[in-house]
Amino acid sequence: MGSALSSLAATELILGGQKSGKSRRAEQLAAAWLAGAGHRAVFIATAQPWDVEMVERIARHQSDRAERVPGMLTVEEPLRLAEAITQHSRADTLVVVDCLTLWLTNLLMPAEFKEKSTLAHIWPAQVATFLVALSAAPGPLVLVGNEIGLGVIPMGREVRAFVDVLGTLNQQVAQRCQRVTLMAAGLPLTLKDAA
């Protein structure tokens, strides 16, 4: 993955498609951080076990993380991301959030979501609170999210709305991060580096 692992930005947003290598890169950054004396790392997982496949995926990710980044604490927090960042961020602690896309999904379509419901309207306040926590975090942050706006325009109204909201969130986070990396085929492309 190269030279970008040699220095950790105070804040890094890692975007990419499914299986692009974004989570692996975040884990590599965490492992490099943990090699430093007195360093800690906390992984905030936002996935919820919606179905059997997701339960299996979460278990596989937990196992893989424990193997690749031993010593990193995992916190499962699908909704209260700002509070989790505030609680765990310290100068000696790297916080990895994986992923912003699932977190936004959780806000927009909570567990009690029904097919005829519209997108939840609680998300703007939650996103604003998260952005404040991101900017105020005393320790380094690595944020993982999906870039889903590169494909064809979706047919469904709610799917188009989600793509729009996620695109806006990604832009807001990218503005606040020192480094923004786009992952493709396991390779990092640096979009922004103000570190």
Where are the regions a protein language model picked out?
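Conserved P-loop
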Residues: G2, L8, E12-S89
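Short low-complexity stretches enriched in small and charged residues
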Residues: P49-R57, V97-C99, W103, S135-P140
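Residue-level signal for inorganic ion chemistry
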Residues: A26, H61, V96, N146, ...
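Short, conserved beta-strand edge motifs with alternating hydrophobic and charged residues
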Residues: I44, T74-E76, V96-C99, L143-V144
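SAM-dependent methyltransferases
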Residues: M1-A9, L94, A125-T129
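Loop/turn-to-beta-strand initiation segments
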Residues: G71, A91-L94, A137-V142
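A basic- and aromatic-enriched beta-loop-alpha substructure that forms the phosphate/nucleotide-
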Residues: P78, Q87-L108
